[in-house]
Amino acid sequence: MSTFGYRRGLSKYESIDEDELLASLTAEELKELERELEDIEPDRNLPVGLRQKSLTEKTPTGNFSREALMAYWEKESQKLLEKERLGECGKLAEEDKEESEEELIFTESNSEVSEEVCTEEEEESTEEEEEEEEEDSEEEEVTTEVTKHINGTVSHNGVNPDNSKPKTFKSQIENINLTNGNSGGTQRNTESPAAIHPCGNPTVIEDALEKIKNNDPDTTEVNLNNIENITTQTLSRFAEALKENTVVKTFSLANTHADDAAAIAIAEMLKVNEHITSVNVESNFITGKGILAIMRALQHNTVLTELRFHNQRHIMGSQVEMEIVKLLKENTTLLRLGYHFELPGPRMSMTSILTRNMDKQRQKRMQEQKQQEGHDGGATLRTKVWQRGTPGSSPYASPRQSPWSSPKVSKKVHTGRSRPPSPVAPPPPPPPPPLPPHMLPPPPPPPAPPLPGKKLITRNIAEVIKQQESAQRALQNGQRKKKGKKVKKQPNNILKEIKNSLRSVQEKKMEESSRPSTPQRSAHENLMEAIRGSSIRQLRRVEVPEALR
């Protein structure tokens, strides 16, 4: 009955016209109906994360322009690329202002502002784009004028002093020409400070090269580390200049994209130069060919003590490592090698080579010190002897004098003439009369005979040796065996007693505790031992008893 009643309730909606109902609905009711239908039957083409209905009721403030957003991103990326290429470290104040205005404009376009404000911002953005295009054209004109001035054709006089951006661009170009070493002139920039590389290395390449060529006494180290825009030809020029230099001690060009050509130029320099003690070519593009060229050059170099070539782009390989060890076997001056050998064999042999070199350097240093001491000692020998002869001052204070005067002993000199007459001694008293015999004391008892005691142990080693020698002589003279045995046992017993007396009490206790207990023999064992030790000659005939006959 329930199902029939439900169908009966639905039958009344069959005669209703749907179009009339939809036409009678308002706009808000239609939106609500669409939301309900979306929840009931979502669009299958949309991903699952986007099928839910939007819960935000904020009205859009303006039309979204994808082209404007793409243009803004392209412009920002171009600016970043230019800054990286020019090596600009800090931002100028005007650029900061312009970028902040552009960011404000871009954010305000997406904020809750009316459409009228949005149109005004679009007009401002178009005006700023036109201004930037004009500034770009001015920068291009400045660059052309600067290049003409460098080539020596036109003088640089057409720059507007009010515009600070072209000036900064000009200074950046001049700094690049100075650091890269590609410009032919010697123009200096007086308006801007010294050029700074993006890597942070403040070395000016052209100045450093000139100092090396002029053999400047202040430049003992050439540091070209992390300069990426330096060319292989420039590195070769440095190597050529260092051939005749006598001041530079350290030459480092880590992370400069140096290749085998630069390594071969450095090898040629090491064959000639006798003053450089440290070379660093780590983190470059040098292969095994360039490294082996440097190792062959070290066979003719007796000054270099440190070489670093680890972390190259190409792997050296086992063959190159073994060849390095072979080439460095004859070298006796290299003390530090900056490379991690992959194979254990070359690694251990290289460690032994470096240890040998360090030991030789230590011996050489000690020998030089001895020679210096010998030269100094010959000159100051007399002074040393004189110093030994003179008494040195005592570190202790002198003893204080006693407040009491010491007693004076009068010396009496007795002579024969001045000797006074000696007084006459009185006569001795007469002896007492003898006592009667019954009054005499009893005589003392006779002394007891000495007890036969043990012989005292003498610790005189000389006496023991004499006794041993006498015993040996007695044996050699052909005395009887019994007598020889007794004499032989006597020194042995004395030696044992000496050893026991010299031992400590703890050692004796340890010996007694560690010594096993002597086993007690039975009567049967004694009988069997006597039978074993007897012979037929010792046996005697015994009559057989009558009971056994």
From Swiss-Prot:
<feature type="compositionally biased region" description="Polar residues">
    <location>
        <begin position="469"/>
        <end position="478"/>
    </location>
</feature>
<feature type="compositionally biased region" description="Pro residues">
    <location>
        <begin position="420"/>
        <end position="452"/>
    </location>
</feature>
<feature type="region of interest" description="Interaction with actin 3">
    <location>
        <begin position="523"/>
        <end position="542"/>
    </location>
</feature>
<feature type="modified residue" description="Phosphoserine">
    <location>
        <position position="24"/>
    </location>
</feature>
<feature type="modified residue" description="Phosphoserine">
    <location>
        <position position="406"/>
    </location>
</feature>
<feature type="compositionally biased region" description="Acidic residues">
    <location>
        <begin position="95"/>
        <end position="105"/>
    </location>
</feature>
<comment type="subunit">
    <text>Can bind at least three actin monomers and thereby provides a nucleus for actin filament formation. Interacts (via N-terminus) with tropomyosin alpha (TPM1) (via N-terminus). May also interact with TPM2 (via N-terminus). Interacts with FLII.</text>
</comment>
<feature type="compositionally biased region" description="Basic and acidic residues">
    <location>
        <begin position="358"/>
        <end position="376"/>
    </location>
</feature>
<dbReference type="GO" id="GO:0030016">
    <property type="term" value="C:myofibril"/>
</dbReference>
<dbReference type="GO" id="GO:0097512">
    <property type="term" value="C:cardiac myofibril"/>
</dbReference>
<dbReference type="GO" id="GO:0031430">
    <property type="term" value="C:M band"/>
</dbReference>
<feature type="region of interest" description="Tropomyosin-binding">
    <location>
        <begin position="1"/>
        <end position="42"/>
    </location>
</feature>
<dbReference type="GO" id="GO:0005884">
    <property type="term" value="C:actin filament"/>
</dbReference>
<dbReference type="GO" id="GO:0003779">
    <property type="term" value="F:actin binding"/>
</dbReference>
<dbReference type="GO" id="GO:0030838">
    <property type="term" value="P:positive regulation of actin filament polymerization"/>
</dbReference>
<feature type="compositionally biased region" description="Basic and acidic residues">
    <location>
        <begin position="496"/>
        <end position="514"/>
    </location>
</feature>
<feature type="region of interest" description="Disordered">
    <location>
        <begin position="358"/>
        <end position="455"/>
    </location>
</feature>
<feature type="region of interest" description="Disordered">
    <location>
        <begin position="179"/>
        <end position="200"/>
    </location>
</feature>
<feature type="compositionally biased region" description="Acidic residues">
    <location>
        <begin position="113"/>
        <end position="143"/>
    </location>
</feature>
<dbReference type="GO" id="GO:0005865">
    <property type="term" value="C:striated muscle thin filament"/>
</dbReference>
<comment type="function">
    <text>Mediates nucleation of actin filaments and thereby promotes actin polymerization. Plays a role in the regulation of actin filament length. Required for normal sarcomere organization in the heart, and for normal heart function.</text>
</comment>
<dbReference type="Pfam" id="PF03250">
    <property type="entry name" value="Tropomodulin"/>
</dbReference>
<feature type="compositionally biased region" description="Polar residues">
    <location>
        <begin position="150"/>
        <end position="163"/>
    </location>
</feature>
<feature type="compositionally biased region" description="Polar residues">
    <location>
        <begin position="179"/>
        <end position="192"/>
    </location>
</feature>
<dbReference type="InterPro" id="IPR032675">
    <property type="entry name" value="LRR_dom_sf"/>
</dbReference>
<dbReference type="GO" id="GO:0051694">
    <property type="term" value="P:pointed-end actin filament capping"/>
</dbReference>
<dbReference type="GO" id="GO:0030041">
    <property type="term" value="P:actin filament polymerization"/>
</dbReference>
<feature type="region of interest" description="Interaction with tropomyosin alpha">
    <location>
        <begin position="1"/>
        <end position="47"/>
    </location>
</feature>
<feature type="compositionally biased region" description="Basic residues">
    <location>
        <begin position="479"/>
        <end position="489"/>
    </location>
</feature>
<dbReference type="GO" id="GO:0045214">
    <property type="term" value="P:sarcomere organization"/>
</dbReference>
<keyword id="KW-0963">Cytoplasm</keyword>
<feature type="region of interest" description="Disordered">
    <location>
        <begin position="469"/>
        <end position="534"/>
    </location>
</feature>
<dbReference type="GO" id="GO:0007015">
    <property type="term" value="P:actin filament organization"/>
</dbReference>
<feature type="region of interest" description="Disordered">
    <location>
        <begin position="91"/>
        <end position="166"/>
    </location>
</feature>
<feature type="region of interest" description="Interaction with actin 2">
    <location>
        <begin position="165"/>
        <end position="499"/>
    </location>
</feature>
<dbReference type="GO" id="GO:0005523">
    <property type="term" value="F:tropomyosin binding"/>
</dbReference>
<dbReference type="GO" id="GO:0030017">
    <property type="term" value="C:sarcomere"/>
</dbReference>
<dbReference type="GO" id="GO:0030239">
    <property type="term" value="P:myofibril assembly"/>
</dbReference>
<keyword id="KW-0206">Cytoskeleton</keyword>
<feature type="coiled-coil region">
    <location>
        <begin position="457"/>
        <end position="515"/>
    </location>
</feature>
<feature type="domain" description="WH2">
    <location>
        <begin position="523"/>
        <end position="542"/>
    </location>
</feature>
<dbReference type="GO" id="GO:0045010">
    <property type="term" value="P:actin nucleation"/>
</dbReference>
